[in-house]
Amino acid sequence: TSYGNGVHCNKSKCWIDVSELETYKAGTVSNPKDILWSLKE
């Protein structure tokens, strides 16, 4: 599921695809890896 701004969720995990972030496209983000985190219930 996509929440916009590069944020996606699948079951209990969400991640940010930095390639979709405007700041990344603008070259202000240096780390090309996705940012992962778990959803808090």
UniProtKB/Swiss-Prot annotation:
Segments traversing the membrane: none
GO biological process: defense response to bacterium; killing of cells of another organism
Keyword Secreted: yes
Pfam families linked: Bacteriocin_II
Disulfide bridge partners, by residue number: 9-14
Keyword line: Antibiotic, Antimicrobial, Bacteriocin, Disulfide bond, Secreted
Locations listed in the record: Secreted
PROSITE patterns, per database record: BACTERIOCIN_IIA
Superkingdom of this protein's organism: Bacteria
Cellular component GO terms, alphabetical: extracellular region
InterPro entries assigned: Bacteriocin_IIa, Bacteriocin_IIa_CS, Bacteriocin_IIa_dom_sf
Principal location class: secreted
Function according to Swiss-Prot or TrEMBL: Bacteriocin active against S.aureus, S.typhi, B.thuringiensis, Klebsiella sp., E.coli KL16 and E.coli Gj137.
Family: Belongs to the bacteriocin class IIA/YGNGV family.
Designated name of the protein: Bacteriocin
